A protein has these predicted regions:
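Active-site loop-to-helix "anion-binding N-cap" substructures in soluble metabolic enzymes
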Residues: 1-249
Length: 249
């Protein structure tokens, strides 16, 4: 299963807000076949969202997963994710890397644990402002990819999300042609470093809205989007999904 549009709610949502969200989404989504769409609510709301989204085909994922289980207070194991019905997990979001000091090696272990148990992975990479200004984005991304993914056997259950840190919540979206070139670079590096020469789908994340989605989705190597703030509004999320479905028509 290939996921194209994913909403990352981060630490947002409430029981009432989630109910309103699903109503807005249902009223605005154009197609009943939405199996390539997904959201990552806070873990505590996953069961509620499964019930609210029942019959829609909307996938539910976790925002993070741990590499093992047991005496790890606050961690969420792969088994727990699967048990509550998650079909995938984000791994490596910049906020996890920064706030929880997760290294490339830590993230590699998470990817391995998820793949061994059949949980799909959306692996996040992205450069900080300093690398963007210094024009060393490719070198930074290559290091993240090689240290986390080298010699792993990847399949269609693995997706990359390119999320430049400096573009998160800033309304500073890179030029679509620059994003496209970066996505092509990412695909080439993953293809060359993975054990089976796998070329992944690459989603873009960083201030994606319905206003810039059409321009982004026209690019050859932008396969979809990982959406933050805009995904908190059910109507806005549906509009972005509709734009992606109708791209090139």
């Amino acid at each position: 299963m290939s996921l194209s549009i994913i909403g990352n709610w981060k630490s947002n949502g409430s029981i009432k807000l989630n109910e309103s969200w699903i109503l807005e989404f249902k009223n605005c989504i154009n197609d009943s076949e939405i199996s390539n769409l997904a959201i990552c609510p806070p873990f505590i709301f996953i069961d509620q969202m499964f019930n609210l989204a029942s019959g829609l085909g909307l996938k539910i994922g976790s925002q993070d997963v741990d590499s093992s289980s047991g005496a790890r207070t606050g961690a969420i194991s792969v088994e727990a994710c699967i048990d509550v019905g998650c079909c995938f997990s984000l791994i490596g979001h910049s906020e996890r890397r920064e706030l929880f000091h997760e290294s490339n090696i830590d993230l590699r272990q998470k990817v391995i644990a998820a793949q061994e148990r059949g949980l799909q992975v959306v692996f996040c990479i992205g450069e900080p402002k300093e690398q963007h200004i210094a024009a060393t984005t490719n070198e930074f991304l290559e290091e993240q990819i090689i240290n986390s993914l080298s010699d792993l056997e990847l399949t269609d259950s693995f997706t990359i999300a390119y999320v430049p840190i400096w573009a998160i919540g800033t309304c500073e979206t890179p030029d679509s042609s620059d994003i496209n070139a970066t996505h092509k670079f990412i695909k080439d590096i993953v293809q060359s470093t993975s054990k089976n020469n796998f070329t992944p789908n690459v989603l873009y994340g960083g201030s994606v809205t319905s206003k810039n989605a059409e321009v982004l989705f026209k690019e050859q190597y932008i396969d979809g989007a990982l959406i933050g703030g805009a995904s908190l509004n059910g109507k806005e999320f549906a509009e972005i999904a509709n734009i992606h479905k109708n791209r090139g028509l």
